[in-house]
């Protein structure tokens, strides 16, 4: 039992949906914490709204509440479960803010709940900018010259006093949200107003900019007795001025002198002791590169993105140790899980280099402002481990899946030196490639260091890589001798990177390596620099003499992970990978995971029998397969990242379990798939590939408008659009053919029907559908951005039977063994197939939890040859539950400047929440609250700008809103429509007309909700785009789908109140 015998039942608050600034790292740390508490015999109650997580599985906590993360719903859980304690620091900023609010409102006191781990007072001292500054003053800790402000007037006065640029940091926000660097009073007006609005306590810290100083982080653990260790220190390659979540980070720090290292280490420990932290804490410093001057930027008195990185970089399980400290244990009483010999009071030591590189969503949002600053924009990250910096960095670059295997980027070849300088002075996600091009042109290293703020140590490393690339470019393959190839491999060059420079095939380099026996060995991450034997096999590749992998002769399977979190491929795929591993382990099969994401549960050291922290490229995966010689490789759970390895593994005669490469190709190749549908007599929307604007117009005439147009070979709906007339179609096609003349544009009849989705399992003979899901929004909104309902609410028995029939025909026709995801449209009583994915999809965690069918477990067993009829869940459509569960998407577009907000065929959401209720309205109400949609407001003002073809449908919804007491503001045509129906409306000028116009209405806070149905997709020159962006940047609700608006209005009519709703424990 825990040292503190009074702790019997602990409430853990999760972090909710994945948004930019708060991603999968909290699933990893929350899962670890729950396990750590349960190991000590403590009952764990969890509240978290995110169904895509491992954390919300029924076996992770004793009681699992997938409910909105608001004070009202957390109080309901506390009232029902009566925990004696609350652990606040595992749910990111969301969990911390909730814990503080529960404390301030007296709810914790009312129910006798104690906060364990770091106290609320200590959390406030770490999070409240003014209290933190007072602590620093008390211990003589240097801080940057700053002022705490709560209004615009004082903010401007301070800025005028110390001069620009000024850094704006709101209190209690996430990932730098609402912050930024103001270079002028005009910029300060905009950033400060938003920062004050988004801070939960209306407080902002303004500080003098030390942009260009080094940014250093320490991850520190402290127990209740004051024992303190630094787990890991990390150096941001990018200087202060770029959010640490958007920075390239290296561990351990590479450029600090011993004096600097010890100085900052002592300062970190001093801060933790002064605040009284109990658990993990992240401390961020700014260090003057030209002196020993430093300042504390901020601390995070909780587990964080950096603590997940530090855990994976060192093998030290920070969240688990923090949970034990919260129970009263001291560091010298907690065993190191990796070595089982040392204790948690031993500081880890690293004999390797770790590099973290962020993954940005700009491939999805090509019009976005890519310049990096103090506001985080990355959706995820990769981690790479090497025996030297160059190896780790090059591994990291190819792990990003951006098609880069070197530091060369074609588009920078055309730029002048002045243009390249601009690209690194205003750094964006591609700055390293611009920097490399400058070095390629012999720009002086000290000058590059000066203008970028990147230490000369790193510039020298990049220079060496660039010089080797240049040397290869000027060579032939015959010039490549054994010694040179070994040196390149040791420094992280890939076969493809070398081959591209030599203009040969990667296979040629692979052949040479085999002739010369230049193959990687694998070293272990052991937390102690090899001083003690590690029991948890966690490996990285290097080109060295001694190999630390022991290859067994057991039956074994390699599971390929899904890589970094990104829009379209999120935490859902990590959930599936982890469940696959658990299923294999239950069957007594040795499990091996290959992945490169430091935020996830799959890369925890004790999930699989072996973990290889490696890039998910053909070469890196093949090296592991050749080392381990598994009985098979599973690709179905790693999203497109894993699936795209299928053909390569087939060419190498490597067995993939389940669906084969040819079968995957049948589902993904349009022509082959069309042939199959024809053969099976299954309908799909009519369409074809076209090669010119004229062809497109001709085809559209045959099909009839509206039509869905999209480029060939895209993922996540990228570049898709619905066009309603010839003018829109010509505009889309002209742009599309200008970008890509080599591939056809696909044009389909757009059916404005009901979209229905299934995740099914096939064993080659039978099919099991755990649940049929219905989308609230009509077809045309990407399935990942749609509200999903289960059980279906409007699907007839006949259509359900047809869905089962088509699913079985398709699964058996393709030859699926394992998972298949199918999307259907029901239109005018007919059923059409629109898409088939021969793998696990993003709805698997959701439907697994709400149907209570262990989908991944069953699919894994089927891949290994078992039959559905023997697995206890039958075949056909599984029985439907009584409760209704909705999955509501969550967006991060506010954090991405110049990004389109409206829903369409291209996916934009970063996360999701679950709403569970006895009725659809109750479930939707909870889902909307959990997704932070402003649904509780009784009345307000709606700004409506409605597209012509939506006006008729909008009218009855507008009448309902009017009857509820809402007022309207609208532009001319929409205003006329409302007036004709007797609805009072204030007419407002359009964007191009003189002030006050529609944008002024938004900026002057005259509006509570914006309803805008767009006319032309992603054209940022149009009024609608600017209206939506202005609203989202003022933190207003923006609705672009009338289906969503109708659902919200229906809920308001039901007058649902928090106090009347039930909460549901989904662990049973």
Swiss-Prot record:
Which residues are ATP 1-binding? 129, 169, 175-176, 208, 210, 215, 241-243, 284, 298
Q: In which pathway does it act?
A: Amino-acid biosynthesis; L-arginine biosynthesis; carbamoyl phosphate from bicarbonate: step 1/1; Pyrimidine metabolism; UMP biosynthesis via de novo pathway; (S)-dihydroorotate from bicarbonate: step 1/3
Q: Where is this region: Oligomerization domain?
A: 402-549
Reaction(s) catalysed by this chain's protein: hydrogencarbonate + L-glutamine + 2 ATP + H2O = carbamoyl phosphate + L-glutamate + 2 ADP + phosphate + 2 H(+)
Give the span(s) annotated as Carboxyphosphate synthetic domain.
1-401
Q: Name the needed cofactors.
A: Mg(2+); Mn(2+)
Q: How does it assemble?
A: Composed of two chains; the small (or glutamine) chain promotes the hydrolysis of glutamine to ammonia, which is used by the large (or ammonia) chain to synthesize carbamoyl phosphate. Tetramer of heterodimers (alpha,beta)4.
The record's HAMAP family line, in alphabetical order, gives: CPSase_L_chain_A (MF_01210_A), CPSase_L_chain_B (MF_01210_B)
Q: What is this protein called?
A: Carbamoyl phosphate synthase large chain
* Native source organism of the sequence: Clostridium botulinum (strain Kyoto / Type A2)
- Gene behind this protein: carB
């Amino acid at each position: 039992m825990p040292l503190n015998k009074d702790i019997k039942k602990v409430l853990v608050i999760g972090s909710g949906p994945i948004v930019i600034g708060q991603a999968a790292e909290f699933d990893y740390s929350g899962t670890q914490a729950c396990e750590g508490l349960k190991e000590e015999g403590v009952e764990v109650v969890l509240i978290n709204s995110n169904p895509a997580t491992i954390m919300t599985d029924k076996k992770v906590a004793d009681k699992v509440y997938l409910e909105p993360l608001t004070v009202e719903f957390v109080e309901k859980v506390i009232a029902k479960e009566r925990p004696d304690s609350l652990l606040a620091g595992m749910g990111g900023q969301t969990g911390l803010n909730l814990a503080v609010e529960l404390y301030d409102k007296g709810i914790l006191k009312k129910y006798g709940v104690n906060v364990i781990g770091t106290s609320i007072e200590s959390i406030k001292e770490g999070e409240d900018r003014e209290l933190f500054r007072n602590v620093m003053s008390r211990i003589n800790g240097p801080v940057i010259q700053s002022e705490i402000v709560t209004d615009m007037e004082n903010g401007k006065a301070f800025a005028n006093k110390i001069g620009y640029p000024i850094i704006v940091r709101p209190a209690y926000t996430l990932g730098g949200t609402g912050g930024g660097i103001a270079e002028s009073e005009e910029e300060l007006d905009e950033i400060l107003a938003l920062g004050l609005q988004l801070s939960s306590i209306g407080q902002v810290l303004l500080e003098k900019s030390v942009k260009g100083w080094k940014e250093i982080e320490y991850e520190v653990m402290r127990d209740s007795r004051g024992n303190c260790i630094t787990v890991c220190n990390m150096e941001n390659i990018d200087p202060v001025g770029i959010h640490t979540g958007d920075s390239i980070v290296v561990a351990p720090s590479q450029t600090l002198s011993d004096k600097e290292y010890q100085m900052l280490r002592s300062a970190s420990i001093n801060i933790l002791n002064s605040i009284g932290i109990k658990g993990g804490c992240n401390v961020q410093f700014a260090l003057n590169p030209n002196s020993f001057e430093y300042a504390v930027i901020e601390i995070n008195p909780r587990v964080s993105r950096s603590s997940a990185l530090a855990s994976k970089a060192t093998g030290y399980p920070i969240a688990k140790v923090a949970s034990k400290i919260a129970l009263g244990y001291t560091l010298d009483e907690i065993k190191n899980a990796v070595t089982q010999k040392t204790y948690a009071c031993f500081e880890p030591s690293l004999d390797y280099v770790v590099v973290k590189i962020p993954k940005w969503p700009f491939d999805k949002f090509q019009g976005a402002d890519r310049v990096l600053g103090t506001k985080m924009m990355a959706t995820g990250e990769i981690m790479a481990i090497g025996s030297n910096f160059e190896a780790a960095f090059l591994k990291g670059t190819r792990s990003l899946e951006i098609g880069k295997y070197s530091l060369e980027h074609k588009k920078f070849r055309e730029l002048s030196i002045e243009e390249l300088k601009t690209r690194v002075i205003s750094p964006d996600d591609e700055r390293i490639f611009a920097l490399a091009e400058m070095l390629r042109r012999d720009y002086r290293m000290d000058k590059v260091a000066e203008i970028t703020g990147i230490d000369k140590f790193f510039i020298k490393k990049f220079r060496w890589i660039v010089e080797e690339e240049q040397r290869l470019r000027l060579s032939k393959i015959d010039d490549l001798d054994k010694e040179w190839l070994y040196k390149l491999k040791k420094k992280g060059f890939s076969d493809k990177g070398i081959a591209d420079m030599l203009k040969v095939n990667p296979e040629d380099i692979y052949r040479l390596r085999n002739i010369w026996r230049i193959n990687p060995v694998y070293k272990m991450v052991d937390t102690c620099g090899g001083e003690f034997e590690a029991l948890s096999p966690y490996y990285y590749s290097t080109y060295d003499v001694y190999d630390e992998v022991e290859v067994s002769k057991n039956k074994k399977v390699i599971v390929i992970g899904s890589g970094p979190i990104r829009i379209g491929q999120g935490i859902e795929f990590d959930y599936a990978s982890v469940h696959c591993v658990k299923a294999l382990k239950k069957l007594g099969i040795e499990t091996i995971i290959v992945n490169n994401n430091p935020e996830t549960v799959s890369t925890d050291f004790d999930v699989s029998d072996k973990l290889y922290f490696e890039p998910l490229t053909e070469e890196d995966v093949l090296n592991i397969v050749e080392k381990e010689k598994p009985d098979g490789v599973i690709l179905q759970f790693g999203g497109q990242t894993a699936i795209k390895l299928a053909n390569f593994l087939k060419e190498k005669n490597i067995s993939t379990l389940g669906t084969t490469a040819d079968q995957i190709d049948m589902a993904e190749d349009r022509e082959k798939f069309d042939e199959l549908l024809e053969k099976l007599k299954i309908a799909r929307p009519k369409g074809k590939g076209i090669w010119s604007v004229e062809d497109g117009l001709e085809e559209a005439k045959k099909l009839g408008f509206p039509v869905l147009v999209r480029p060939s070979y895209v993922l996540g709906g990228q570049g898709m659009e619905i066009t309603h007339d010839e003018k829109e179609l010509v505009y889309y096609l002209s742009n599309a053919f200008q970008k890509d003349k080599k591939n056809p544009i696909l044009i389909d009849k757009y059916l404005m029907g009901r979209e229905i989705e299934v995740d099914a399992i096939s064993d080659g003979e039978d099919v099991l559908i755990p649940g049929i899901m219905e989308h609230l929004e009509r077809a045309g909104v990407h399935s990942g951005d749609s509200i999903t309902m289960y059980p279906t609410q409007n699907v007839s028995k006949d259509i359900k039977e047809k869905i089962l029939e088509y699913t079985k025909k398709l699964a058996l026709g393709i030859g699926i063994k394992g998972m298949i995801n199918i999307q259907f449209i029901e239109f005018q009583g007919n059923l059409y197939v629109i898409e088939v994915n021969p793998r696990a999809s993003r709805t698997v965690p959701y439907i697994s939890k709400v149907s209570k069918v262990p989908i991944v477990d069953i699919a894994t067993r089927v891949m290994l040859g078992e039959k559905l009829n023997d697995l206890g869940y039958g075949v056909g459509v599984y029985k439907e539950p009584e409760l209704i569960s909705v999955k509501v998407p969550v967006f991060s577009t506010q954090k991405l400047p110049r990004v389109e907000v409206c829903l369409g065929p291209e996916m934009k959401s970063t996360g999701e929440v679950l709403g569970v209720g006895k009725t659809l309205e109750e479930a939707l109400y909870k889902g909307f609250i959990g997704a932070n949609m402003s649904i509780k407001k009784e009345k307000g003002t709606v700004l409506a700008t409605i597209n012509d073809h939506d006006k008729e449908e909008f009218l009855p919804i507008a009448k309902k809103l009017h009857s509820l007491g809402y007022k309207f503001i609208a532009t001319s045509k929409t205003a006329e429509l409302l007036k004709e129906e007797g609805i009072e409306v204030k007419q407002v000028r359009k964007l191009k007309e003189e002030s006050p116009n529609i944008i002024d209405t938004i900026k002057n806070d005259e509006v509570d909700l914006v309803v805008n149905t767009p006319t032309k997709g992603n054209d940022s020159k149009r009024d609608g785009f600017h209206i939506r962006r202005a609203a989202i940047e003022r933190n207003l609700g923006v609705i672009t789908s009338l289906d969503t608006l109708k659902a919200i209005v229906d809920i308001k009519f039901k007058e649902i109140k928090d106090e009347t709703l039930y909460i549901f424990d989904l662990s049973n």
